[in-house]
Amino acid sequence: MAQVVDGDTIRLTDGTMIRYIGVDTPEVRRREGTQWVSAPEPYGLEATEANRMLVADRTIRLEYDVETHDRYGRVLAYVYTDDGMVNAALIEQGYAAPMTIPPNVRHADMLRELGRAAREAQRGLWKDRER
């Protein structure tokens, strides 16, 4: 793993962009014309740091679902370290919301349940929000 781009995307050493399946984190930048500008949404920086803590200096493994690439050319994957699935950990910690986009639904039920528990416990981005 080379670089954490944001809370749900990493760039490998060969330049391949990996977008985590089943999660959505707050953005840290947005496009203005042809430029990317820093514009963190609430909890965007925290989600990026949580992702960094989960994958930095770790060997990762990728699990694919039905669709392997998104419309931007990024590889879609469930990302694993020796500690488990990063996608699930981000939701469990409250730094990501579950986001199901068929046909990539292999772990959707589990991710939704983790999201429900994080929301009820008001962890991370769910803090101070209505249950």
Where are these regions (language model features)?
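Small beta-barrel nucleic-acid-binding modules, primarily SNase/OB-fold domains
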Residues: M1-R131
